[in-house]
Amino acid sequence: SILEKMQRKHIPMEKMEEEIEDIAGIRIICQFEEDIDTVASIIRSRSDMTIKSEKNYLKHIKQSGYRSYHLIIYYTVDTINGPKRLQAEIQIRTMAMNFWATIEHSLQYKYKGEMPLHVAERLSNAADAIIALDREMSSVRDEIMDAQNSSQTQSNLVKDILLSIENLYKISNKREV
């Protein structure tokens, strides 16, 4: 895969480490789309890596329907020959986005990049459904959080009322003595 990419982009072997950004990589899977920004912010704040570039395929969706957030980073590792600065790609996406991307990647491989139009259209429709699914799951999460906050507020109110009753009871007992 790396050698194919080098041939396709006419990259000589001695330039591989500086010109191919995704030799190493990690994929971070989030439950909710809004978590992606949080994770990206945490990565940006790290002092042990430097951000080379960011690609926001959430706002700039690829024509295929691909959505994800990519950061290309520089990271220093210790080797037998001393410290070495490497490039790596960090992909951040939701579980639903990852499911779609995995299927799309398999189909691209199967069709060798020449996916039939009817399959590409179905993938595009599935990508739209993934967007709707991620939004719906975020909405459900918001409702659950609102319900939990409301429940906590009610619980605090009951505690306050019971404390007031207890204080009134103590005051009334002191007056009787």
Residue ranges of each PLM-predicted region?
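Intrinsically disordered, low-complexity acidic/polar and Pro/Ser/Thr-rich regulatory regions
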Residues: 136-177
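Proteins with a high burden of low-complexity, intrinsically disordered sequence enriched in S/T/G/P/A and R
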Residues: 1, 106, 112, 167-176
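A structural signal for alpha-helix termini and helix-coil/disorder junctions
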Residues: 8, 12, 45, 49, ...
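Long beta-strand-rich cores associated with HINT superfamily self-processing modules
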Residues: 17, 29-139
